[in-house]
Regions:
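N-terminal small/polar-rich segments of proteins
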Residues: 3-103, 135-170
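N-terminal functional modules and adjacent low-complexity/disordered segments of proteins
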Residues: 1-2, 14-16, 108, 123
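Amphipathic, heptad-repeat alpha-helical segments used for oligomerization and assembly
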Residues: 109-151
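Surface-exposed molecular-recognition determinants
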Residues: 100, 105-108, 112
Length: 170
């Protein structure tokens, strides 16, 4: 899935990731499940999901929140978590030009989103500066869905949404 959200100011998301964990077993203990491996999904795990941001303001921050995973007839508890690990952050110069350069600028803290729609700070104001385009790479093998014990109904498909919030301004 490719979504592009840009605002009149030009600020917004150039690309947001989709996380698919495939079919999971119901377990009697808390479990962490990795992303599914498939040829048509991030190159069978050889490519990383990423979030790419465009912003024009020098002051900006990023938060994310995870909704409660739901199926047609069931919900996973709000104690369910999406673990993204620490994400390397890169900036771009000459973006979308033949001379484009991607530069490593740092790493986020380990990212953990609870499935309760609570905003979690990913990047603080002025944590990264000097560019208008940034990318967070989520290491494929570090992305996990943590499900509490005895949760889920066999045969159900659960979906949740990550809301990425780019805050810009003076």
């Amino acid at each position: 899935e490719f979504r592009r959200v840009l605002f009149r100011s030009g600020d917004g998301f150039i690309s947001t990731p989709t996380f698919d964990f495939g079919k999971l077993a119901i377990s009697g203990s808390k479990q962490q499940y990795g992303l599914k491996k498939a040829a048509d999904y991030y190159g069978n795990g050889t490519r990383n999901p990423y979030l790419r941001i465009k912003k024009t303001q020098p002051n900006w921050s990023l938060t994310a929140q995870l909704s409660q995973p739901k199926s047609a007839t069931d919900s996973l508890p709000t104690a369910t978590r999406l673990l993204l690990g620490a994400a390397p952050v890169s900036s771009f110069s000459n973006y979308n030009q033949p001379t484009e350069l991607k530069n490593a600028v740092g790493t986020t803290s380990a990212i953990s989103l609870n499935a309760n729609n609570t905003a979690t700070r990913i990047i603080a104001n002025q944590q990264f500066t000097g560019s208008n385009i940034y990318q967070l790479d989520f290491t494929f093998n570090n992305v996990k869905l943590e499900v509490p014990a005895n949760q889920g109904v066999k045969g159900q498909q659960y979906q949740a949404a990550i809301t990425w919030n780019l805050v810009t301004g003076p």
